[in-house]
Amino acid sequence: MTRKRVDRRTFLKLSGAAITAPGIAACAGTNKVPTEGVPRSRFDDESTAEEVTAGIELGGKIAVVTGCTSGIGYETMRVLAKRGAYVVGTGRSLDKARAACSSVIGKTTPVALELSDFDSVVACAEAIRSMNTPIDILICNAGYLGAGDGTEVINGIEKHFIVNHLGHFVFVNRLLDRLFFAWQGRIVVVASRAAYTSAPDAGIDFDNLDGRYAYKGRSAYGQSKLSNVLFGLQLGKLLRGTRITANSLHPGVINTEIDRNLNRFMQLGFAVMTSLGGGKTVQQGAATSCYVATSPLLGSTSGKYFEDCNAVTVLGNSHMQDEAMAERLWQVSTELCRDFLIEHRQPNRDDFEKGLRNSKSG
């Protein structure tokens, strides 16, 4: 007997929408359209990372993947390495990163990265910089999803915001010049549909970044994911005219270790949903990251948001295309992280050509 696949929306209706974990909430009333000017791919929500990279040769390319120790981060690293890329994989501990990297067929290097600790972020970035090589692909994949039953604050900032956004904000800043030296650098920010299903109605609450007022874990997670999308939007704007692109994406609902901090009911919701076919496998969940990072169709696409391997525009009051909010987020993030950031100048032609020679000879 063939089991019929239950789509995510039908599953939520059948369950009475009882599962309220971020990113699982039904999107009834949300209108999404294909983004104009971006080539459509033939891939969809059932495509896997191996399928979307079939025939793509990444030999000589350097990729950095944060959160490589499990889930879609591990699968992303595995597939990129399989296609020939040299992958630097990060984990919260060096032992975990080393174990993940050693189990992958291909060239990898493990580095420790704790996104909630900016000193760790700087140390990780400096270790990668010391490799003295261009970076072709930088995938900001690591993330945090809290239990939702209380505010956790780190250095005066709510944990979702500091781990999911600010940590990567510093990380990208410290590695940006290495992407300038690549033939065509790509920054991929793994966000979530929670950016428009769970974020505060007014968008990012800049006056409550410590979560002290009316804290709700789901809203805090959604706010951090909206920050990911706006980070990609602003990066795309600031990098216009360069060879670097930046895009964000929703990987899908996947039963991975990101739910380890949820209560048992919510963890059960993730497991049941994926087992019934309402979610994605890890192989499918890594597909959009790998597609955005490698597709020849997207060489000049920047500042866009992707779902199921295609760029989409979310209509309505989602704030995902709010350029003023994106600019303010950049300014606030810069102020909060000022002591850990470095200033950049765009490399001149001699610098750039030297970087290209190093990239091609690597």
Question: Model-predicted segments: where are they?
Answer:
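Generic structural signal for alpha-helix termini and adjacent loop/cap motifs
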Residues: 30, 131, 295-298, 340
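C-terminal helical subdomain
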Residues: 121, 224, 273-313, 323-328
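C-terminal tail/cap regions
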Residues: 298-362
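Rossmann-fold NAD(P)H-dependent dehydrogenase/reductase core
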Residues: 17, 34-257, 266, 338-350, ...
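N-terminal secretory signal peptides and thylakoid transit peptides that target proteins
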Residues: 1-19
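Residue-level signal for the nucleotide or nucleotide-sugar donor/cofactor binding architecture
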Residues: 6, 92, 116, 279-287
